[in-house]
Amino acid sequence: AGGNGGWLWGNGGNGGSGAPGQAGGAGGAAGLIGNGGAGGAGGQGLPFEAGANGGAGGAGGWLFGNGGAGGNGGIGGAGTNLAIGGHGGNGGNAGLIGAGGTGGAGGTGGGEPSAGASGGNGGNGGNGGLLIGNSGDGGAAGNGAGISQNGPASGFGGNGGHAGTTGLIGNGGNGGAGGAGGDVSADFGGVGFGGQGGNGGAGGLLYGNGGAGGNGGAAGSPGSVTAFGGNGGSGGSGGNGGNALIGNAGAGGSAGAGGNGASAGTAGGSGGDGGKGGNGGSVGLIGNGGNGGNGGNGGAGSLFNGAPGFGGPGGSGGASLLGPPGLAGTNGADG
């Protein structure tokens, strides 16, 4: 772990990166004035083991300073579909004045040729200063691993991290994007679904804009197969936009598209459904309501009776007391 900064002044040290199978070190905290250290990256997973998690970012100074960024999660190891990607570390919190740290990204899933592991989740953003400061963005999620041989399924995409909270004055951070589901390039095997986008942070209690929700991850698709037409996976939902009191609310994230069904000699695969768009944030007093995110498109059905996937619904627009409401997101098209 990184060392702490001086009691009066000084930045916290950065955490070290983890060796294979070991978590990243946490960032050191600052004292009265200074920035928190960044968390170290998690190591790649050993064979048959998950990727290690990223270290958390250190806290910013009690009076002034930004929180450190969270470390990224490690890639999952080989040999099993339980070898998920490591989760990203959370961003450090600010003290009285300062911005929260960004959450670390999730690691890509590991696995084996016939069974893919899911991606790791993104870390949550750190909280902004109690008085003034923006909250940190959520980290992006890791993608699920694909498979190249016949087996159970490919990996699911991880979920994006949520933005941190703000204090009195500040803008909410954006939610992290969901990871994509793994593809299948074999005769049969289930495909991974897309992960959900993280929620945007709310604006400050007195003033500030809400953050946007993260986009949902796209679903995996089966490849060109001959024995059995695999179904496309469902797209991930978009995150919700952050609310605001005085300021503009955040927009909802767009959803991921459903995967296409694969063609086959006897029975074609069905397309996956698109995810739901995130809802726009609402405004309590003055400002624009957030627009809803768009729904994901449905995947196409294959030849030989493969059914198309349904498009996902768009998110609703946010309301505003003394301002225009947000627009609803468009519905995704059917496959």
Annotate each language-model stretch with its function.
Residues 1-335:
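Long, compositionally biased tandem-repeat segments
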